[in-house]
Amino acid sequence: MEKKTMEFEINNGLWTIEEVSEEEMIREGEKDYTLGLTIYKTQRILLLRNQKNIKKTLVHELMHVWLYEYGHNAQDRQFNHEDVCEIVASCNDFVSDIAKRFLR
C-alpha cells in the first residue's frame, strides 16, 4: 500500500502529513493506542493508517501545529472562554482547508 503524504505551509514553515502503520508510529516512540502525532522538530504530522476517525485525528493534530506556529506552547495551560473562541475563529479556515485537501 502506498503511503499517503501531503505538504502544506503555515507561517513560513513547511510541514508534512503522513499516514503511517502502527509499527512506524511505535518507532517514533508512541504507544500502540496513538492515533496521531505532531513532531515539531521535523515539522511532521503522523496519522495512524486505517483508523475510523482520521478526520478528527487530523484536525486535532493540525490544531497542535497552528497553536505552535502562532506562539502557543504546551506550557499554556489556561485559556478562558474568549481565548478559545478567538483561537477557533482564527484557525478554522486553515484547519478546514488542509483537512479537506488531505482527505480527498
Predicted regions and their residues:
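Catalytic zinc-binding patch centered on the HExxH motif and its immediate surroundings
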Residues: 1-9, 18-44, 55
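Small, basic N-terminal interaction modules of short regulatory proteins
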Residues: 52
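Active-site recognition of the HExxH zinc-binding catalytic motif
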Residues: 56-68
